[in-house]
Design a protein with these regions (language model features):
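Acidic, proline/glycine-enriched N-terminal capping motif
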Residues: 1-137
Length: 137
């Protein structure tokens, strides 16, 4: 199940305020990092300008499941926000797929609600793209 980056939490220990990730976000980042390390298997991190392509399949709420006419895929216009899903993926891939998230210069993403018989998923790919030419249009 895709996980969105949660708001930071704060705690006070001995007069010092400490910010930390919620457990769900922390575990989601670890899962993304593990999958990224497995996919990269000894490859060096990408350096140039990158195009991030992502697709998130969110599970259908149980209240919408139908027995006679199963529901098909559709765009998900409810929570979680697409930008928060992307933040978690970018944070999890940092240092593994690329060294600096500033190298991601283009993003193509969509968030859908899975069909009734489909498992939730996250698909991510990174592609190095050509730098813009110096010629002005």
């Amino acid at each position: 199940e895709p996980v969105a980056q949660g708001r930071p939490r704060f705690s006070n220990h001995g007069g010092f305020v400490k910010a930390y990730d919620p457990a769900k976000s922390r575990n989601g980042k670890q899962h993304v990092r593990y999958a990224a390390k497995h996919a990269m298997e000894g490859e060096t991190p990408l350096l140039g300008p990158l195009h991030l392509k992502a697709e998130f399949g969110i599970m259908m709420p149980k209240s919408q499941a139908r027995k006679r006419t199963p529901r098909t895929r559709e765009y998900r216009v409810k929570k979680p926000d697409l930008d928060n899903l992307l933040k978690l993926v970018k944070d999890g891939c940092g240092g593994v797929v690329y060294l600096d998230d500033n190298t991601v210069v283009m993003i193509t993403a969509r968030k859908i609600q899975c069909a009734q018989d489909e498992a939730p998923f996250t698909r991510v790919s990174f592609e190095e793209i050509e730098p813009l030419s110096d010629a002005s249009s």
